[in-house]
From Swiss-Prot:
Entry cofactors: Zn(2+)
Species assigned in the record: Sinorhizobium medicae (strain WSM419)
Protein name (database record): Chaperone protein DnaJ
Protein family: Belongs to the DnaJ family.
Subunit structure as annotated in this protein's UniProt entry: Homodimer.
Residues noted as binding Zn(2+) 2 in the record, renumbered to the chain: C163, C166, C185, C188
């Protein structure tokens, strides 16, 4: 009895496309023949993994498998009636009837070449790295063109042959009652070619799974959520087809002191009550490592902002710079000594409305408001 395809990949039946691809890559790296030379069981597992993924990654084939199981792909179960002869399975009919109606024909170029899949890589950087920019080295597990057969899938010294069933088109026509429907060629699988002597390294696929090290240029001023495209650095195409692209999705880690809004930075700085009252100065270290002095005038209130022009983030692909805003927070003294408490009580006694005009005016206005309501 054939093994369940979901069990083969080690995923749940509800697994999405991302989970399927992740499981496939992990298992393909583990059981690849290059990593297990002479191990027949590993080679068998590798083939089963490939077959399971090829079926489940295709929404139409997956729907057929979920409904009918392996019977959906057994050959010869639906009779003959397709131009060119040869047995065919339910999967072909399912694909033709529904795939053609819904525009589901797989795009192929001449010779069965297929474009490789696009890949996604998530990268996290610090705010300092986003400020200065950097060149990062990343390791990406992906399918690359087989260096033995150069992507043809055929053993060196041999070549793929034009499929005799479809004459190289990859499609054959089928009679379905009163209709004539075109379907994928059952002999070559739509490639238009057949390989009688496959490459021993890639087993006729034209590509192998390996890890590659790539350099990624992160420009100064890049923002959280930016996507960088590396053209042609995705999965290698099948049978010599063009490679897909690699997309780097960047996220900038939260900073301990700075918050970012576009090219501007904000920093909340706590100061003492006496500094806010009497005035003072302090230094802040900016992202470029330099220090900038902030002068606090006497009588500064909580929430006051001071602007340091040009001390924010670089504007992407520009010579302009954002600004840095210092937001004042006033820290109230805690755990006072007896002498400190006496001094503050004395200060309270000699204070006047002129010293605290906002609070004095507020309570006066509030009292007047409620007195008016009670009249």
């Amino acid at each position: 009895m054939k093994r369940d395809l979901y069990e083969t990949l080690g995923v749940q039946k509800s697994a999405d496309e991302k989970e399927l691809k992740s499981a496939f890559r992990k298992l393909a790296m583990k059981y690849h023949p290059d990593r297990n030379p002479g191990d027949n069981e590993a080679e068998k597992s590798f083939k089963e993994i490939n077959e399971a993924y090829e079926t489940l990654k295709d929404p139409q084939k997956r729907a057929a498998y979920d409904r009918y199981g392996h019977a959906a792909f057994e050959q010869g179960g639906m009779g003959n009636g397709f131009a060119g002869g040869g047995a065919h399975g339910f999967s072909d009919i399912f694909e033709d009837i529904f795939g053609e109606m819904m525009g589901g024909r797989q795009r192929r170029s001449s010779g069965g070449r297929e474009r490789g899949a696009d890949l996604r890589y998530n990268m996290e950087i610090s705010l300092e790295e986003a400020y200065s920019g950097k060149t990062a080295q990343i390791r990406v597990p992906t399918s690359i063109t087989c260096d033995v057969c150069t992507g043809t899938g055929a053993k060196p010294g041999t070549s793929p042959k034009t499929c005799g069933t479809c004459q190289g088109t990859g499609r054959v026509r089928a009679a379905q009652g009163f209709f004539s429907i075109e379907r994928t060629c059952p002999t070559c699988g739509g490639r238009g070619q057949t390989i009688t002597d496959p490459c021993t390294k890639c087993h006729g696929q034209g590509r192998v799974v390996e890890e590659r090290t790539l350099s990624v240029n992160i420009p100064a001023g890049i923002e959280d959520g930016t996507r960088i495209r590396l053209s042609g650095e995705g999965e290698a195409g099948l049978r010599g087809g063009p490679a897909g692209d690699l997309y780097i999705f960047l996220s900038v880690k939260p900073h301990e002191f700075y918050q970012r809004d576009g090219a501007d930075l904000y920093c909340a700085v706590p100061i003492s009550m006496t500094t806010a009252t009497l005035g003072g100065k302090f230094d802040v270290t900016t992202l470029d490592g330099t220090k900038s002095r902030v002068t606090v005038p006497e009588g500064t209130q909580a929430g006051k902002q001071f602007r340091l022009k040009g001390k924010g983030m670089p504007v992407l692909r520009s010579s302009q710079m954002g600004d840095l805003y210092i937001q004042i927070q006033i820290e109230t003294p805690q755990k006072l000594t007896k002498r400190q408490r006496e001094l503050l009580q004395e200060f309270e006694q000699i204070s006047s409305k002129e010293n605290n005009p906002e609070s004095a005016g507020f309570f006066s206005r509030m009292k007047g408001f409620f007195d008016t309501l009670s009249e």
